[in-house]
Amino acid sequence: MQDTHISLAHGNGGRYMRELIEELFARHLANDRLDIKVDAASLSLESRDVIFTTDGFTVQPLEFPGGDIGSLAVHGTTNDLAVAGAVPKYLSLNAFIEEGLEIAQLERIISSLASAARDAGVKVVAGDTKVLRRGEGGGLYLATTGIGFKDPGMNLGLDRIQDGDMLLVSGSVGDHGISVLLAREQFGLRGDLKSDSANVLPLTLSLIH
């Protein structure tokens, strides 16, 4: 792409939007289930119990120590499926991009999202982009929907908690929230904490296998 910043033209359905989708999003997210020429994905559900979830991400700043809004969107969605006893399989992605966002930053974030999706074993199979007028968004908002298949051996859920159960956490409590807070540089705080945003599926699988 020759443009350096997002303009309203990237959201009007014409050539600029096509270039944005083909040369940035599709280049990083390409897979055998993603067809950018249609507005829906055809999926095989394999006659298994399906679990799905949806989430939105508006974190500021968009990039922070240990992660960014792209990897966070994947981890947040796939982890919701994992802790519900599902193995994540597919994602949809909606990107609400503010006019003026640097395309280089957008590409870093989408590349990070694609890498996180590959690591989690999921495919982005459908998506949409919208461009917001300058001042109407925080640079980039992402919305995702995730689909996973319930693992027969993963009977997880809040309703199964009993007295005497052990509480398992995946790391130090609060690392992600504090790292984002430090990156905002609003309160004169300093530190070297990094976000611990990560895929927890290996952890949930280890509980029952």
Regions found by a protein language model. Give the residues of each.
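Helix-biased detector of long, well-ordered alpha-helical tracts
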Residues: 1-208
